[in-house]
Amino acid sequence: AEHVIKQMERRHFNAYYCSTKEEALSKALSIIEKGSVIASGGSATIEEVGLLNYIKTHSEEYTFIDRSIAKNEEEKRQIHAKAILSDYYLMSTNAFTMDGQLVNIDGNGNRVSALCYGPKHVVIITGMNKLTPSVEDAYKRIRQDACPPNCVRLGLPTPCSKTGVCGDCMSASSICDLFVTTRMSRYPDRIHIIMVGEELGY
């Protein structure tokens, strides 16, 4: 982890390593200022760490833009638009590399767009199980190991949700529409990456 932290810092990311989920939660809360407006991309990792639940149950300390309350696609679109102006955007990354790059595949694009631009800060929590040797390996990992179980979790009728294997589909339900590699951050102190020494997410 020490090597990856150095590589990430070289890319103007703030990087940290925590041994456990509990440490990761504490670290994330030390980064997020009270009184902030917070939004989140869909993330099993953020939920597993307990960060999402903490933010939601401390409404006196934070304003949370909750996408789960959307009743239809238009409301969801408006909530995603508000998230772009949040103070802190919470997410995981689909993979990250030994040389410190972030690699993500997205469906709607709301998650990767927030990573690229908009929120003042992005807080990323990721398990060390998502570490890969290279960007090419990262994309392979995501399509082979992450997206099929994610489609099952989301109840999407994609070929991979049935077979467990990426079929390189063009399905309307595909979550593999946008491929984004984040090489560095133009703005220092914007992107915070918390690596956790546990298997988290997909």
Across the structure, where does each feature detected by a protein language model lie?
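N-terminal active-site beta-alpha-beta segment that forms phosphate/nucleotide-binding
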Residues: 2-80, 85-90
